Amino acid sequence: MTKIVRSKYKASRRLGVSLWGDGKDAFNTRNYRPGQHGQNAMIKTSDYGLHLKAKQRLKCHYGRVTEKQFRNLFVLAQKMKGNTGENFIGLLESRLDTVVYRMNIAPTIFAARQLVSHGHIKLNGKKADIASIRLKEGDVIAIKESVKQIPLIQESVSKQGQTTPGYLSFDVHSLTGKYLRVPALSDVPYPFEAEVHLVIELYSR
C-alpha cells in the first residue's frame, strides 16, 4: 500500500467520515480516530472545530488541493453572482482532475490527478496536464490512445453507469466524456454530508 493510500485512509478516520466512499477504507471497520487511544478518546469539539472539520473534509475529498487553491476558489465564488456555496462547489467540480474522477476514468481523485499530470488526458483534442484547469460547459475530455488499455483505466471505466453524475456524460466505447453543465450541490455524489455552509461561515470570519 502506498504512502498516499495509507495517509488518505488515516484522514477518513481522523475526520470521522469515509471521504471517498471506498470499500477498502479503514474507516468502514475502524470508525474512530487513529492512534493508541483513538477508540476511547473523548473529544469535545468547539464551534470553530466543527467549522474547521467541515472544511477539512471537503478539502480532503478533492485530493491534493492546497489550502491556498481552496481559499482562492472561495474568494472567486464570493465574487460571482448567486449563492456563494453553490458557486464554490461548481468551481471545485469543474477542475479537470475532479471531472476525470467523476467520469470514472480513474478509481480515485489521486489517480485522476496523476493521469492528468502525466499528460494522459486530452481536453478538446489537446493535451491537458494541469489538474486545476477549469472546464466550461460543452468541453470534451478524452483518454490518449496510447494509454486506453492500461488496466487501471479499463477497470475504472467498467463501472460506468453506476455513479457517473448527471452533469457529465461518458461514452465507454470511445472513452470520451463531456462536461454538460455546472452542478448544484445536490447533484454531487459526496459519500458524506458536505456541510458547505460551515465552510463558507469559516472563511467569512
From Swiss-Prot:
- Is Ribonucleoprotein included in the keywords of this UniProt record? yes
From what superkingdom does this record's organism come?
Bacteria
Q: Name one GO biological process term.
A: ribosomal small subunit biogenesis
InterPro entries on file: Ribosomal_uS4 (IPR022801), Ribosomal_uS4_bac-type (IPR005709), Ribosomal_uS4_CS (IPR018079), Ribosomal_uS4_N (IPR001912), S4_RNA-bd (IPR002942), S4_RNA-bd_sf (IPR036986)
CDD domains named in the record:
S4
Entry keyword Ribosomal protein: yes
S4 RNA-binding domain location is: 94-157
Q: Which residues form a coiled coil?
A: none
Alphabetic keyword roster: Ribonucleoprotein, Ribosomal protein, RNA-binding, rRNA-binding
Q: Name one GO cellular component term.
A: small ribosomal subunit
Citing just one GO molecular function, the answer is: structural constituent of ribosome
Q: How does it assemble?
A: Part of the 30S ribosomal subunit. Contacts protein S5. The interaction surface between S4 and S5 is involved in control of translational fidelity.
Member of which family? Belongs to the universal ribosomal protein uS4 family.
What the entry lists under HAMAP family is as follows:
Ribosomal_uS4_B
Q: What is this protein called?
A: Small ribosomal subunit protein uS4
Q: Which organism is it from?
A: Rickettsia akari (strain Hartford)
Lineage, broadest ranks = Bacteria, Pseudomonadati, Pseudomonadota, Alphaproteobacteria, Rickettsiales
Gene name on record?
rpsD
